[in-house]
Amino acid sequence: MTGHHGWGYGQDDGPSHWHKLYPIAQGDRQSPINIISSQAVYSPSLQPLELSYEACMSLSITNNGHSVQVDFNDSDDRTVVTGGPLEGPYRLKQFHFHWGKKHDVGSEHTVDGKSFPSELHLVHWNAKKYSTFGEAASAPDGLAVVGVFLETGDEHPSMNRLTDALYMVRFKGTKAQFSCFNPKCLLPASRHYWTYPGSLTTPPLSESVTWIVLREPICISERQMGKFRSLLFTSEDDERIHMVNNFRPPQPLKGRVVKASFRA
């Protein structure tokens, strides 16, 4: 077992087993998906996406046994996403990553069948309508997750502060202070996106997410990517299992429409 709660990414507890504990895994709006770019519907009514992130709202960095996660102060609307397909602001709660063992897999969403080495998820919640993140996470319009693909190539200078902190959270269950990191530095120049109704990609797999997947990837170096792959699924006392391939494969679209903010 690579995780707590009886789920992980191993042979015996990986995505193909999740439906036993979480039947919604076979639901009608599951994520991720394969985005077929030619079938995405250009929607001129979609608003431009605005990510208004204040500089000093990050709190901590954690290895939760499934990913590495940076948590934020979400007590007010200082760090929000607005526009796009959303009505009103959604507050940033945390961001985390999914990645592969090698560069040919790692992302959760795929585009025309192509995987990227990694995918960043910025998780936001609808604080106008719901009083807690937990309440929002089980409501159909409760969450908005911005997905950013990572490819490898040139070094990403802003990513160094994050990758240089990973040694502090190598083991599952470890946490370190991580203040004043603005995730705006991890966004690509273009705000073009695809959007569709979906779910969390980890248990409980709640169908509460408006997905906003940015078209343009960001680039990090193989050295930086290697620091993610040196994290462990396991605690300090356990046999070491490297944290790699922590992604769920694409799920059936089941009639959902993927909208695009741009003309193909």
UniProtKB/Swiss-Prot annotation:
Activity modulation comment: Activated by histamine, L-adrenaline, L- and D-histidine, and L- and D-phenylalanine. Inhibited by coumarins, sulfonamide derivatives such as acetazolamide (AZA), by saccharin and Foscarnet (phosphonoformate trisodium salt).
Positions contributing to Zn(2+) binding: 96, 98, 121
GO cellular component: cytoplasm; cytosol
Active site (record annotation): 66
Binding site for substrate: 201-202
Required cofactor names: Zn(2+)
Gene behind the chain: CA7
InterPro entries: Alpha_CA_VII, CA_dom, CA_dom_sf, Carbonic_anhydrase_a-class, Carbonic_anhydrase_a-class_CS
Protein name: Carbonic anhydrase 7
